[in-house]
Amino acid sequence: KDLKWKTGAIKAIKVLNELNYLTVVITNQSGVARGYFTEKDVNNFHNHMNSQLKKRKIIINDFYYCPYHILGKGKYKKKSLDRKPNNGMIKKAIRKWNIDSNKSFFVGDTFADQMSAQKSNIKFYKANKNLYLLIKNILKYESRQKFL
């Protein structure tokens, strides 16, 4: 219910799907560690995203999230190699989907996103106000089998 898509995001994912690009979400979710919401809530949110996309015949291929934070509570209070700026989640996606990092790109909006991509030797692009226009420009310069 709290889902608000960034401008151009749905159209960007649609274009990537149509061109057979792999789309993967990599996200830190410290709200789990802090007790604001649960892992089930995160998974439900991701499922809700894809259910909205499915109505338009669009899909995000996979989701990776890190629920841990050093200031978290209970079992979630810890350092994690998955938490960006580390690249554990990207490594998992690379293994699962047989992704070629040299032919991939990562769109993100934080310095942690940029560092995570760099540690994986993946080209990074800073998200702007319109993700569709950004993806359109990226596609002018990139080859197939991409990572988002």
Task: Give the location of each predicted region.
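Short, acidic loop-to-helix structural element flanking the phosphoryl-transfer center
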Residues: 1-26, 33-47, 81-87
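Short alpha-helical scaffold segments that flank and stabilize functional sites
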Residues: 12-15, 30, 96, 119-120
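Short, basic/glycine-rich phosphate-binding loops at helix/coil junctions
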Residues: 23-24, 64-75
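Short, flexible active-site-adjacent loop segments at beta-strand->alpha-helix junctions, enriched
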Residues: 29, 67-69, 110
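A short acidic, helix-capping loop that chelates divalent metal ions and anchors anionic groups
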Residues: 32-36, 71-76
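Asp-based, Mg2+/Mn2+-dependent phosphohydrolase catalytic module
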Residues: 40-61, 73-106, 110-148
